[in-house]
A protein has these predicted regions:
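Glycine-rich phosphate/pyrophosphate-binding beta-alpha loops
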Residues: 37-44
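Short secondary-structure boundary segments
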Residues: 106, 160-161, 191
Length: 191
C-alpha cells in the first residue's frame, strides 16, 4: 500500500453513533480483536484486555449504569449544568444501539518513572501525566478502529462511560476480567 492509499483510508474512517440492525459474526469479532496483537506498546507489555459484548440485554444494562450514575449527580449541580448534561446524554449512551461493544481494560500502572530511577540509580525526567499503559491503549484502540474500517464496519471510540461508571462496569464484569485491570475505553462497532 502506498502512502496516498493509506492516507485516503485514514480519511475515510470516521466515528459513527448510529448503526444498522445487523449482527457481527464471531469470526469478524475475532479477526478485529486479533489485529490488536500487532500494536506496539512500551516494553512490549501489551497491557490490555478486551471484553466483546453482543448481548443486547448486557449492553443496555451497562448503558443504564452510565446514565444512572450521571443522574445521581443532578441534585448537586446547577440547573444549567443539568440541562447541558441532558443534551449531552446521547453521547454517553449511544452505544446501546451498537451490535457490538468492545470494552478495553488496561493494567494498573504499578511501575513509575520514580521507581525506575530509584531501582537503577539513574537520572530520568519525571514526565507529567505519563502512563505507559494508557499510551499503549490509545495505540491499540486506534488499531481496532482501523481494523473495523478495513473489515467494512463503522466504529466509535468512547471514554465517557469510563468517567461516569468505571467502577460499576468493572464490578459488573468482574467475572470476565482480573482485578488488576481498569476499564478505560469502550469501542462501538456496527454497520
Amino acid at each position: 500500500m502506498d502512502l496516498n492509499t493509506f492516507k485516503n483510508f485514514l480519511i475515510k474512517r470516521a466515528s459513527h453513533s448510529k448503526f444498522k440492525d445487523e449482527g457481527i459474526t464471531k469470526e469478524d469479532i475475532t479477526k478485529i480483536v486479533d489485529c490488536a496483537r500487532f500494536t506496539p506498546s512500551g516494553h512490549n507489555q501489551q497491557p490490555w484486555k478486551f471484553v466483546a459484548v453482543t448481548d443486547k440485554k448486557l449492553i443496555n444494562t451497562l448503558a443504564d449504569k452510565v446514565i444512572s450514575n450521571l443522574a445521581s449527580l443532578y441534585p448537586s449541580l446547577p440547573e444549567e449544568t443539568v440541562n447541558m448534561l441532558e443534551k449531552y446524554k446521547f453521547f454517553l449512551e449511544h452505544f446501546r444501539g451498537a451490535p457490538l461493544i468492545i470494552l478495553v481494560f488496561t493494567t494498573k500502572n504499578d511501575y513509575t518513572t520514580s521507581e525506575i530511577k530509584r531501582d537503577f540509580n539513574i537520572k530520568l525526567a519525571e514526565p507529567k501525566h505519563f502512563d505507559m499503559e494508557l499510551l499503549g491503549v490509545g495505540a491499540v484502540v486506534n488499531n481496532i478502529l482501523l481494523a473495523c474500517e478495513a473489515a467494512g464496519y463503522v466504529s466509535c471510540w468512547l471514554t465517557e462511560p469510563v468517567v461516569y461508571a468505571q467502577k460499576e462496569i468493572e464490578e459488573y464484569l468482574k467475572e470476565y476480567i482480573e482485578d488488576n485491570y481498569n476499564f478505560v475505553s469502550l469501542i462501538t462497532v456496527g454497520r
